[in-house]
Structure formats: structure tokens, C-alpha cells
Amino acid sequence: MILRPASLDDAENLARLGRESFCHAFEHLYRAEDLAAFLEEAYSVEAVAREIADPGIVHQLTEDSPGSGLTAFIKTRLESPYAEHSEARKPFGLGQLYTDPARTGEGLGAALMDWCLNFARSRGCDAVQLSVWSENYGAQRFYQRYGFGKIADIEFWVGEQCDHEFLYELRL
């Protein structure tokens, strides 16, 4: 497995993997128009390219070998958008941790999480924060294995639909 940072050349493949992963897990929850609006906002090639170019957002990718195709990714923010919910002085944000649905359970998520925690520590962060859907029990168990715990109830919007999410935090 190769672990590497994203470049602008990855925008199209990263957008595709983001859309596929999100739809595989959550498509059944939303009206078609809400899902379409969200996917355009979050996973259009242009939106992903803007994020890759943003120095405050860091994507890390996995692939089997150079050029073989993306198998998983993590999107992080150097400053958590949820800082007001914590007493941490410098919380780091974990935005997405998605794996190709056919590759779940192969350790890709664990490799990316290990990278994330080490990267946050290297940046002097004292916490990592993430949001997780209140009914995504598998993801919650994964995060809890790393020591994350719930610190708040928050909202996540997909189009005009509001989801109940949990804000998880791990103090470093």
C-alpha cells in the first residue's frame, strides 16, 4: 500500500471515490434532489480541486501501487470547524475517512487514521475532532477503538435534510 498526499491531478479520481463511498453508505437516506445538491457541492471535481489547493485542508490517499487507482482517502483540516465545542486549545479536524466499498476491512482506514493522528501531533494539535452520523454504528466503533468519544450533538445538512450527528473528539 502506498500512502501519499493528494495533488491537483487527483481531483477527478478523488471526487469519484468520494461520491461512490458516500452513496454506497448513505444514498438510501436522502431524496434524489437533496443528494444531487450535496454531491455537487462536496464532490464535484471543481469542489475537490479547490480543497486540494487550500493550504488549510490536507488530503492523504492510498493506492496499491503508483497509478493503480485510489483505494481510500482522508480529508483533514488544520483547524477544526468544531473548535467551539471543546476546551482544546488547538483542535485538528478530520473531515472524511472513506474507503472504496469493495476494500473495507483491509486496514486502509486504520493506516489513514494512524497517519492523521501522527500528522495532528506533528502540527502541535491537542485534539482531533470529527463528526459521525448518529446511526453509523460501524464508524462509531472504529473511532472509539482509537479513543474518540462523543462531546456534542451537531447537525449535518444534505440538501434540505438535516441529519443528527455526533461530534467525537480524541485528546492528544
Task: Report the location of each language-model feature.
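Extreme N-terminal starter segment of soluble prokaryotic enzymes
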Residues: M1-L3
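C-terminal "cap" of GNAT-fold acetyltransferases
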Residues: Q60, K90-F92, D126-Q129, W133-Q140, ...
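Acetyl-CoA-dependent GNAT
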Residues: P5-D9, R16-H28, A36-A102, M113-W115, ...
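Active-site acidic-Proline motif in GNAT/NAT acetyltransferases
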Residues: D100-A102, E106, S134-E135
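Short coil/turn segments at alpha/beta junctions that flank glycine-rich nucleotide-binding fingerprints
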Residues: E106, R123-D126
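Short helix-adjacent coil turns
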Residues: D9-D10, G107
